[in-house]
Amino acid sequence: MRHKIKGRKLNVTSSHRQAMLANMVVALVTHEQIKTTLPKAKELRPYIETLITKAKKADLTVRRSVLSKIKDKKAVEKLINILGTRYKDRPGGYTRIIKAGFRYGDLAPIAYIEFVDRDINAKGNIQQDANEEIKN
């Protein structure tokens, strides 16, 4: 019985799952929007939300704690300096998940996960990306 067991397995080992989530956090912090499968996006959301909540405090212990979760120093700097100050007055709900149909080949549900009030120049506009995919 799977009672009271949190999280999704995502059909990988625990070390693979931790590394995958850390890499997805780095990509999300860098580009402020990523395209992934829906279960991965749903698993990533609470992970990044806790990191941003910690980053709002912005002291040395927080920096070390976040650096132990994700190993990219540039991503940690952006998380604490830019995103932490951007969401300082917001009590939560820093990300949104937008469903984007199904992947061709295996019909896996695809979703965009992005920051609320994100910098559009960091990655691009979802509507433009969708229009380009339809044209191709």
From Swiss-Prot:
PROSITE patterns: RIBOSOMAL_L17. The gene is rplQ. InterPro entries: Ribosomal_bL17, Ribosomal_bL17_CS, Ribosomal_bL17_sf. It comes from the Bacteria. One of its GO terms (cellular component) is cytosolic large ribosomal subunit. This is Large ribosomal subunit protein bL17. The lineage of its organism: Bacteria, Pseudomonadati, Pseudomonadota, Alphaproteobacteria, Rickettsiales. It comes from Rickettsia massiliae (strain Mtu5). Belongs to the bacterial ribosomal protein bL17 family. Keywords: Ribonucleoprotein, Ribosomal protein. GO terms for biological process: translation. Transmembrane segments: none annotated. GO terms for molecular function: structural constituent of ribosome. Part of the 50S ribosomal subunit. Contacts protein L32. The keyword Oxidoreductase does not apply. SUPFAM superfamilies: Prokaryotic ribosomal protein L17.
